[in-house]
């Protein structure tokens, strides 16, 4: 499971469809669908139940979304903190 896959998964949840997520992520739908299938395969669960009106999260999907959102937020804040720390200059005396 990669952060990129979690970003894709969250985008699908937040836009309500694979096609909407593909537009939001500026990518085509087939690679996004492929990554979703890879994630489901790796986790051995269905994350969405496909209905005539689109996709609905399964119980496993809801749990993953909660955890993925937290992980992505944490990764983003960590990246910002590390970047800011790297920008600080150290003044050495002596």
Locate each region found by the language model:
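Interdomain hinge and pocket-entrance segments immediately C-terminal to HTH DNA-binding domains
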Residues: 83-94
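Short helix-boundary/capping micro-motifs
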Residues: 12-28
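Helix-turn-helix DNA-binding elements, focusing on the entry/boundary residues of the two helices
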Residues: 17-18, 36, 50
């Amino acid at each position: 499971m990669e952060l990129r896959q979690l970003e894709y998964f969250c985008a699908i949840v937040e836009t309500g469809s694979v096609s909407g997520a593909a537009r939001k992520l500026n990518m085509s739908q087939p690679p996004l669908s492929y990554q979703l299938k890879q994630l489901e395969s790796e986790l051995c669960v269905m994350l969405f139940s496909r209905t005539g009106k689109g996709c609905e999260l399964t119980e496993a999907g809801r749990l993953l979304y909660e955890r993925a959102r937290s992980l992505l937020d944490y990764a983003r804040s960590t990246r910002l903190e590390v970047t800011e720390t790297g920008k600080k200059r150290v003044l050495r005396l002596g």
